[in-house]
Amino acid sequence: MTIERRELIGGAVALAAVGLPSPAIAKETAMHGLIGKMIAAPDKRDELAAILLDGLQDMPGCLSYVVALDPKDPNALWITEAWTDAAAHAASLNLPSVRAAITKGRPLIAGFGDSFTTVPIGGHGLVPTR
């Protein structure tokens, strides 16, 4: 399938009209994002998810932290995070509540799948901080 120049320009104009942010905004916001797949030990996914979801309100700089079930893998979880910056994420790993969750959850983790670092630029419910 090829896209004609007119369609491309029309699409760009439509996106601009609805106010979607430009990729250039990424440099200004410097938000830090992570998306990762975590594999729980057999029949431990729900228990691991509960640990990951506990105490989320006490993470300074965390704009979004979503734990999702993988509908195709009964042992997999997807974690999607958005942070004010990479430093806030790094600092969170030293919080007592996060250290406790890591200690409690580690025996329930069988492994890890794909993981990606992203630069969030906005979205529903995600407000750039700068």
Label the predicted regions.
Residues 9, 54-64, 82-117:
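An amphipathic, aromatic/His-enriched active-site/gating alpha helix that lines ligand/cofactor pockets
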Residues 20-35:
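C-terminal segment of N-terminal export signals and the immediately downstream linker at the start
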Residues 1-15:
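N-terminal secretory signal peptides and thylakoid transit peptides that target proteins
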Residues 32-38, 66-94:
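Short, well-ordered beta-strand segments in beta-rich or mixed alpha/beta enzyme
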Residues 119-130:
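Acidic/histidine-enriched, glycine/proline-rich intrinsically disordered or flexible terminal extensions
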Residues 37-47:
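Short, surface-exposed ligand-recognition loops at beta-strand->loop->(often short) alpha-helix junctions
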